[in-house]
């Protein structure tokens, strides 16, 4: 379609044209009659939120490209493919090469798309650097398919070998002095806090994305009723008391915090009293793949948990679509045909026993499954900087 016919078609796109305010219709008619460039006209309209879809004025109705095909063409262009390579990619779709070439020409001259390509270029370089970090990590003698399990070292050694290196580790003996380890059980909570109102998540199994809907799944229940429900459940992900319930359960946590203490000597900031988070539920409770915005300790008090971890530098393969979550909830059960990038990840799996504590470094992806009825406590108040979440970028697409 030549410039003259493009101009005429721009006026003849009735639904769009008639939706313009009268002054903009007059402006459009005047500029087209004066022979102004259609693409420049479009950019001005676009800047005022008045522009139609690109292909609605480049092509007639029977020539328009589907939204799916447009997205495919944009993806190929962002990958750096030349027009000839893109045409080869889609030759089986029986679409006129002329339409494709015109569309790509318009897109590549668009100032917004140019900025998008610049950002994509930066992201590609960041991804390359993460890949290099992962490859170099494989040269480390400590880099294996298993996670170290050691007696809790002094705090300086922990910082040097694990915290600062972003290496997960299972620590033994660090909470042997906690009364919680020797007292807490479902029966203990039911007997000593039977009339305590606690907030939990319920009906999780009704939603595939239950973790993203955690706010609407919150319910208030008596502790004795909560314990009765989970004891009557052999295996379920339907009811769970988690860290997401911490704000409402603050008073309850204050009551039981006397059963907790410093981890090993010097690990925690003792003056901070509100950085313990309770996890309590039946066998089968599951927290899907995500990463945390702080370094975390997960202390197992009752029952066992299986934790699957994936290194932070493998984020480019993790289909991170929303906040800290992945489109994939469980990497072990993932459909690799649907999510082929997951073939590049190296999961680490461990089973956490009562009395053991897992250090989960910031940015490390992990999912957690309760193998038994389970009580855990996580905490973040390390005696070093762990205040990174305030600089975390907001999602631009919600």
Please report, for each region that a protein language model flagged, where it lies by residue.
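N-terminal accessory scaffold of Fe(II)-dependent oxygenases
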Residues: 98-357, 365-398
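Fe(II)/2-oxoglutarate
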Residues: 1-16, 21-22, 28, 34, ...
